[in-house]
Structures are given as structure tokens and as C-alpha cells.
């Protein structure tokens, strides 16, 4: 698909305006242009990709935002294939490491070595959690049996109610931090169950092999967004933050930093929490306004360290680790080649990390890498981190950390159109919520809604 028709100077008149040039917005724009509709995409940043951002460490592409793509993520895989962007398996050969209460030990597989009591308890919790998740309708979680009860408690409260051991609670805390960028007490049990159901289960969500972390894009996931935007050409306007959307009889007037556009419809493809940055006239119904305040982003950052070789492999380690010590709580080996450079990527608890100066962030992250893989990690060729909490647009973590009480009160309005205003973002997806695949699916769904009305 190659679109060549030029976009004129403002004010513009098009069929549809899309707000946001992340995976959701670009997917929506591509679907509509394929059908012959005139589309204009407004993006507030000076780049496309949304929560995908590819930087460099030691000259190697490094995903500062979302990194992984896995089986059953068919929408984003199809998009990458169409655009000619390859994936490569995430390195997983060797022993994993778990750092627990001040000591580190190795294990193989998904579940760390715990005591017999701990393993039995983890198995029990997985069974109970999966049973609850299977009973949650992803498209309408408020209709689940015991929906109100599940939504009124946090994941942390649920773990205490079912008398999880301290080891089990610690493992679930690590999972919660890397998944939503928050603590178990911050996220609704109903949201946690729905999220797992949308991924196809805990194994699919957490595993590398046959799971959500199975593959990555060697040149960075932002390539996918850049290639999609290149096809749309001048229809994508950067540095065009949308400030206001007016509804009227003919559709909408969308006011951005680059000018105004008249359209029959608008697709707002940004995280729900950041809808509040746009002024709507007439105002959105109260339920929509409340939803934006009850769908906060988590807090998650990333740290990379590059070495001459992936030295941990020589000791039989995979580079994957879990830790209950801040700031790095999970790591992956994202080295491009076995002969170097060796690159460790760590997910970081942003709450205490983001406010530190770079020297202290570097020191703390390298200290964590060294406690997992040895003192050689203290002397990298290069170190880079990215603090998502400092972003002007969509700051925070990879997805929403929805607190107790939110789904049953406000979930109905998450993607329900308001006249000509339609909604997209990975948070609104029924499959792979929180992932690029969910974002692509949400954009395609919003495009189908609008196309049916054009």
C-alpha cells in the first residue's frame, strides 16, 4: 500500500481525524485509507510509535518502550510481515536467576526454585487465578460472576484472602510490577483476571518460549510504526498535539498545534488516562470524564547495559532474572550476536528511580545487574535508560494499572463512542490488552466502527 495524495495546508477537511500515531492510531488510519477514506493523523510528539521507542546502546538498536511479540499476537505479526520487518527469538538458553531476600540462585523454566511448600502454594494460586480469569468475559468483565466482589478487592488483597505464602506474594509482586508498573495493592483483581484472560492465560502471558516474550524485533519495534507511517506519508502530522475537539451537526472540529481539521468522525487513539488533556465541547458525559481519572498508567522504566560480550552465557546463564530488590526486578539478554556486544535489559521500578540523576540511576541499575550476574556487570561499554514518567504525552508505564472499583463503575464507557468520537488504544482491546497486538486490534476495531457509518 502506497498513498501519494498530498495533504493541503490547514484548515483541512477529511473524512476521519485520528488522534495519536502509535500502533492503534496508525492501524486505524491504514484500514480507513485502504477503503478510500480521507484520513489525517495528528501526533503530539516529534515521532511516531507511541509507547514504542527505539534508541541505541553501544550502537545497537534498543527498545526503550515495548519490546516483545509472541505467538497468537496475530495482528501485530501480520502488520510486521506485511511491512517486511523480521522478528528474532529472545535468547533463553541457560539457567535463569532469582534473587530472593538477599541471595541469588539459578533455576530452569518459568517457575523459580522454591521450597516444596512454596511450589505447592504457587501451583494452588495459579489454578485459582486461572479459574477466575476463565470466568471473566473480556468484552464485558462487569458481567462476570462475582464481578463486583472481584473489582472491589485489589490483587494484593485477594492474595491475602486466599492465604498465599510470602514467597507466592513476592513472585506475584514482581509479575505485577513488570506487567502494570504498580504494586499488587494498586490493581483491581477483576482487572488482573481480565488482563490474563485477554492474553490466553498465565503461561502465555509470562513465558518466553510460546509466550508473550518469545520474539523481538532486531531493529526495534518502532520500525513497525515508522514503516506504517511512511505509507501514510503527509497524512501524518507530527508536533500536532490535539487540544480541543468540538462536536457539531456535521461531525467534529479537531484543533491541533498544527491547525484545525473538519471531519465526520474522530478516533482518539491515546491511553484513557490522557484523554483529559483534550478539551471536549460539549463536554463528555460524566462517566467518560470519571473513567479517565480511574484508568491511570503504571510507572515503569527501562535500563540497558552493553558489554564486549554476553559474559553471563559463558557461565551458563540465560540473562533472564527475577529480583525482589529495587530498582531492577526483571532482566533479559537482548544481545544481537553471541560474540557481542552483550546487552542486558532491565525493567525498572520507576517510582524511586526516575527522579534520580543519571549517575545514581546508572550506579543502582549496574549494582542490580552485578548482584545477578557478577561484578563484570559493573563495567559496561555503555549504559542507557529511559524514564517513561518524564514523557509529556502518555507518561507512565506500558499500560493502565486499573485500581479497584473502576471496571464495574466505568468500564462500560471505555470504548463506547460518543456521537462521532470513537476510541482506540491497547487498553480498549479484547485480546492482548497492554501489548502492541492489542493496540493494532483496537485501531482496526475503531476503523471498522467508523467505516460502517461513512
From Swiss-Prot:
Cofactor: FAD
GO CC terms of this entry: cytosol; plasma membrane
Documented EC number(s): 1.4.3.-
Class of enzymatic activity (EC top level): oxidoreductase
Keywords: FAD, Flavoprotein, Oxidoreductase
Top-rank taxon: Bacteria
Pfam families: Amino_oxidase
GO-annotated molecular function: oxidoreductase activity
Disulphide-bridged cysteine pairs: none
Keyword Ribosomal protein applies: no
Similarity comment: family membership: Belongs to the flavin monoamine oxidase family.
Name assigned to this protein: Putative flavin-containing monoamine oxidase AofH
Source species of the chain: Mycobacterium tuberculosis (strain ATCC 25618 / H37Rv)
Name of the gene this protein is made from: aofH
Amino acid at each position: 500500500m502506497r498513498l501519494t495524495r498530498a495533504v493541503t495546508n490547514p484548515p483541512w477537511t477529511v473524512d476521519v481525524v485520528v488522534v495519536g500515531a502509535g500502533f492503534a492510531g496508525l492501524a486505524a488510519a491504514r484500514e480507513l485509507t485502504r477503503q478510500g477514506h480521507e484520513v489525517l493523523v495528528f501526533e503530539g510528539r516529534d515521532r511516531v510509535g507511541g509507547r514504542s521507542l527505539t534508541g541505541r546502546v553501544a550502537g545497537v538498536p534498543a527498545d526503550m518502550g515495548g519490546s516483545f511479540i509472541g505467538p497468537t499476537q496475530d495482528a501485530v505479526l501480520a502488520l510486521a510481515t506485511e511491512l517486511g520487518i523480521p522478528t528474532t527469538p529472545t535468547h533463553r538458553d541457560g539457567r535463569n536467576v532469582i534473587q530472593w531476600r538477599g541471595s541469588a540462585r539459578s533455576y530452569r523454566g518459568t517457575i523459580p526454585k522454591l521450597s516444596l511448600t512454596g511450589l505447592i502454594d504457587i501451583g494452588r494460586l495459579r489454578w485459582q487465578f486461572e479459574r477466575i480469569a476463565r470466568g471473566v468475559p473480556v468484552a464485558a468483565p462487569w458481567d462476570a460472576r462475582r464481578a463486583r466482589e472481584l473489582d472491589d478487592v485489589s490483587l494484593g488483597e485477594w492474595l491475602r484472602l486466599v492465604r498465599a505464602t510470602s514467597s507466592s506474594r513476592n513472585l506475584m509482586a514482581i509479575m505485577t510490577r513488570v506487567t502494570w508498573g504498580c504494586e499488587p495493592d494498586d490493581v483491581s483483581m477483576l482487572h488482573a483476571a481480565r488482563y490474563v484472560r485477554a492474553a490466553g492465560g498465565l503461561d502465555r502471558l509470562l513465558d518466553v518460549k510460546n509466550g508473550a516474550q518469545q520474539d523481538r524485533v532486531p531493529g526495534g519495534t518502532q520500525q513497525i510504526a515508522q514503516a506504517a507511517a511512511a505509507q501514510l506519508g503527509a497524512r501524518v502530522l507530527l508536533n500536532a498535539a490535539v487540544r480541543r475537539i468540538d462536536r457539531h451537526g456535521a461531525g467534529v472540529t479537531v484543533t491541533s498545534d498544527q491547525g484545525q481539521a473538519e471531519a465526520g468522525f474522530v478516533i482518539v487513539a491515546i491511553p484513557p488516562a490522557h484523554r483529559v488533556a483534550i478539551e471536549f465541547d460539549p463536554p463528555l458525559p460524566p462517566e467518560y470524564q470519571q473513567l479517565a481519572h480511574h484508568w491511570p498508567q503504571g510507572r515503569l522504566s527501562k535500563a540497558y547495559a552493553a558489554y564486549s560480550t554476553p559474559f553471563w552465557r559463558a557461565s551458563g546463564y540465560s540473562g533472564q532474572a527475577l529480583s525482589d530488590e529495587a530498582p531492577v526486578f526483571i532482566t533479559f539478554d537482548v544481545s544481537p550476536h553471541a560474540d557481542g556486544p552483550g546487552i542486558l535489559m532491565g525493567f525498572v521500578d520507576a517510582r524511586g528511580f526516575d527522579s534520580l540523576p543519571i549517575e545514581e540511576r546508572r550506579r543502582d541499575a549496574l549494582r542490580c545487574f552485578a548482584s545477578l550476574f557478577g561484578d563484570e556487570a559493573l563495567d559496561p561499554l555503555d549504559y542507557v535508560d529511559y524514564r517513561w514518567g518524564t514523557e509529556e504525552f502518555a507518561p507512565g508505564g506500558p499500560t493502565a494499572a486499573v485500581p479497584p472499583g473502576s471496571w464495574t463503575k466505568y468500564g462500560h464507557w471505555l470504548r463506547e463512542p460518543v456521537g462521532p468520537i470513537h476510541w482506540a488504544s491497547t487498553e480498549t482491546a479484547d485480546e492482548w490488552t497492554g501489548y502492541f497486538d492489542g493496540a493494532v486490534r483496537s485501531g482496526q476495531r475503531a476503523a471498522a466502527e467508523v467505516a460502517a457509518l461513512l
